[in-house]
Amino acid sequence: MLEIFDVSYNDLTERRSEDLYKLRKITFKDRLDWAVNCSNDMEFDEFDNSGTRYMLGIYDNQLVCSVRFIDLRLPNMITHTFQHLFGDVKLPEGDYIESSRFFVDKNRAKALLGSRYPISYVLFLSMINYARHHGHTGIYTIVSRAMLTIAKRSGWEIEVIKEGFVSENEPIYLLRLPIDCHNQHLLAKRIRDQSESNIAALCQWPMSLTVTPEQV
């Protein structure tokens, strides 16, 4: 089973946090070459703190994917790291969250789930399920052009709030991610058509999804 659930920073075990930060280093530094802070072969920053929650996707006791959530009223990447690009955007009041450090470990996902399993779409849907379960109003995030393309392809009716440039040829985008029933079911139906899971299982939180890996 693919288990997707959330855990607080304080409740992360040492083994799990080390694995998480090492996979983030592989994704964001080694593969994407982002300007991120790394130490001891791990990637973490000032937003990995007691106000943070992580969404983890685990299969066969191995971490496959993750997202980081922070209350939008707390210091986060939108209001601090990229304040020079998006500081003129008036963010809404209310129970919104910011998501960041979205990743799927491609090697583990392919080996454990198979190359055709729609793990990115499942992770998008899990973000909606998490936010709805915890009573949040919506999600804001900053993404690269590549991630924007993947999100649009999923059918999620995201809203681009503003484009900014971290360098001359490197745009990033501030997005509002809707979490209403309509978008939840759009993604659930897309995933159902590409997997063994039914709509009810896909819209639960936490999530427990049957996956039959491809036969090689």
Swiss-Prot record:
This is Acyl-homoserine-lactone synthase. Keywords: Autoinducer synthesis, Quorum sensing, S-adenosyl-L-methionine, Transferase. It comes from the Bacteria. Its EC number is 2.3.1.184. One of its GO terms (biological process) is signal transduction. Required for the synthesis of OHHL (N-(3-oxohexanoyl)-L-homoserine lactone), an autoinducer molecule which binds to a yet uncharacterized transcriptional regulator. It catalyses: a fatty acyl-[ACP] + S-adenosyl-L-methionine = an N-acyl-L-homoserine lactone + S-methyl-5'-thioadenosine + holo-[ACP] + H(+). GO terms for molecular function: N-acyl homoserine lactone synthase activity. PROSITE patterns: AUTOINDUCER_SYNTH_1, AUTOINDUCER_SYNTH_2. Belongs to the autoinducer synthase family. The gene is eagI.
